[in-house]
Amino acid sequence: TQINSISDFTRFMVAIAARSGELLNYSSVAQDVGVSIDTIKRWTGILQTSGIVYLLQPYSNNHLKRAIKTPKSYMLDTGLMAWLTKWLTPETIQQGAKNGQFFESFVVSEIIKSFYNHGMEPPIYFYRDTNQKEIDLLIERDGRLYPMEIKLNDKPSHAQKNFLVLAPEESRIPYY
């Protein structure tokens, strides 16, 4: 795959960094960068292969028919993410409008890297359905799902209510 315009590719990198932790909308990125959707898909593949971006797939099974199918993209290097988005000081990262998004990207990237460092493909997903119920991260181990809600505040909402979409009442999974 060839990159014909470094300036277009740089705008693409900034757009992907600014959207880290969000559903990957190829059309929106293509519009912002001014290139085709196919080009965005190719360039995303380059970032995946290079270990710069991870596409977190949505979790679904037969029971969860309303689950969305679009992956979320995460920058695996939050230092690069900060540089590309010009969030260059700790204060900007901690107090800026996207501080929660940055924190979620950091946590997810560290979990992904932990699995990679143990020679494992990360058995991780996220969940969101058409009713806007969302679980930030699901880790699948030994046939069980471990849901995680990632929040950057000292009074997180009761996220476990969203965990209940994963199983019928009689077979609820534990949440921690």
What are these regions (language model features)?
Residues T1-T49, L55:
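Conserved helicase/translocase motor-coupling segment
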Residues G45-V53, Q57-Y176:
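A cross-kingdom feature that marks ATP-driven nucleic-acid transaction machinery
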